[in-house]
Amino acid sequence: MSGKLIVLEGSDGSGKETQARLLASRRQHDGEPTRMVTFPNYAGEASAPVRMYLAGRFGTHPEDVNAYVASTFYAVDRFASYREDWGAFYESGGTVIADRYVTSNMVHQMTKIADAAECERFLAWLDDLEYTKFGLPRPDAVILLDLPQAVTARLIAEREGKDGGDIHERDSAYLRRCQAAYDVLEARYGWRRIPCSTGDRLRSKEDIHAEICRVLADI
């Protein structure tokens, strides 16, 4: 008996990890067997190509590694995590809350493809790769934590002052394309959008969490 998979998606700084932890804790408190997973799984050996890519080892811009190759890096990391860590729990009926998932591959890699027809082929290829060939479970719900691009840019700039950022975070044009991709995919796949700010002011994590719980009441 398969369990449930709920994905928290959104731009950097939108609070995915915080909200995933709050949601997992809430469901555990309610007596539902629940685990949280995070992607990329930087602690796992299979994330090595992802870490090298984000560090700029294969090129200093996201487009230096094409969408198909970069997607494979992330897909292998997810496959290893599923097989070694949370797959048995999920397949026995547990609920898994994921901070990012296949959805992030869709967003971040489709931005590298300008041609609309090729973008459609890429999305179909990625769906087959991760869900069919690698056998990863499809999400029961995707929550899109929505932040205006200007707020995202400010939060990333504040964080970059501490750690320098990765090749995605350092490319503002790339991040703007990702913001547009979120809008396209949310409409196409029925993701559930949660606004995380009012104007340029962030909502409290408690307020956002309460709305997520309301939106997921049927899952």
Set out the residue ranges of the language-model regions.
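P-loop (Walker A) phosphate-binding loop of NTP-binding proteins
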Residues: S11
